[in-house]
Amino acid sequence: MTISFKGLARGVACAALVLAALPAAAKEFRLGLITPPPHTWTKAAEAFGAELSEKSGGAHSVSVFPARQLGNEAQMLQQLQTGALDMAFMTVAEVSNRVPNMGAFYAPYLAGDINHAAAILRSDTARGMLAVLPQEAGVVGVGFGSAGMRQILSRGAVNSAADLSGLKLRITPFDPILDFYNALGAAPTPMPLPAVYDALANGQVDAIDMDVELINVLKYHEHADTILISNHMMFPMVGLISARVYAGMSDADKAMISELMAKHVDSTLDVYMVKEPEWTDALTKVGKTFKRVDQSFFGDAIAQWETIWADKAPSLPELRKTAADLQ
């Protein structure tokens, strides 16, 4: 068989054109969350994946794994660090377990309401706190979102903070909220979301720290007597990319993926600003005792928290100043 030089050259040229048309690093990314499929964060993750596929011409896609399918947040953060997981929408709570300065976001009454919380999370001060994540946690933070403000749901009556003393109270497992409830004399009990409904129903816990979205959507109020709207803490989320995975991206992909993820993470703030008043109003109609309280309700527990976290979270004074400026 004889192959002419011209024929070979044409074949090489055609192959080169085909290869040039292919993306340099087409990939299906895996993104993990702890939230269930109907949750705002999960919907934002799915929207991010859809837009990334569109903007990359189908080169990139995102498979979303909600509801702890890839493990709890501590496990997913470890997977991000090794590169076994590409991306996550994760509570800042879990990140603060590795980077204590992030605990500043959980200062009691740092934000007055969800609108104020959104403004704080969109500030230069907040975004600047992401810079250390590659070095300290092995992840790249692209921006903040949020869940709703924290409230308290109790199986029994709560007329004062003293009524929380000794109660087994479900929390997300991280130090800032643990310290807050310890200061109140409660018995904070870490527990994953899937276990909360049954734990309330059978009395395994007496109360829970939760936001109004999940109190509504997962119907936690069905096994409670008192809904305490306290807005005592914000509960931010951060969009994360494995630093190992990020390092292997082209500059163009780094820019596109970071921008799109930041956009959809940020969109959760807009959702909560609209929906949180609606979810709160819905809880006034479920036939439970409904109370609104402010920071005076918690007595000196807030000052105790500040004493503990003053050294752990050096960004706290600047973040409080930013919060005051944005009121």
Curated annotation (Swiss-Prot):
Keywords for this protein: Periplasm, Signal, Transport
What domain of life does the UniProt record list for this protein's source? Answer: Bacteria
Q: Does the keyword Coiled coil apply?
A: no
Name where it's found: Periplasm
This protein's record includes keyword Ribosomal protein: no
According to the UniProt entry, where is the signal peptide?
Answer: 1-26
Q: Which GO terms describe its biological process?
A: C4-dicarboxylate transport; transmembrane transport
Q: Which CDD domains match?
A: PBP2_TRAP_Siap_TeaA_like
Spell out the Gene3D superfamilies in the cross-references: Bacterial extracellular solute-binding protein, family 7
UniProt family annotation: Belongs to the bacterial solute-binding protein 7 family.
What is annotated about its quaternary structure and interactions?
The complex is comprised of an extracytoplasmic solute-binding protein and a heteromeric permease formed by two transmembrane proteins.
Please explain the role this protein plays, according to its UniProt record: Solute-binding protein that binds 3,4-dihydroxybenzoate and 3-hydroxybenzoate (in vitro). Probably part of a tripartite ATP-independent periplasmic (TRAP) transport system that mediates solute transport into the cytoplasm.
Q: Which NCBIfam families match?
A: TRAP_S1
What name does UniProt use for this protein? Solute-binding protein SPO1773
Organism encoding this protein: Ruegeria pomeroyi (strain ATCC 700808 / DSM 15171 / DSS-3) (Silicibacter pomeroyi)
> What lineage is on file?
Bacteria, Pseudomonadati, Pseudomonadota, Alphaproteobacteria, Rhodobacterales
Q: Which gene encodes it?
A: dctP
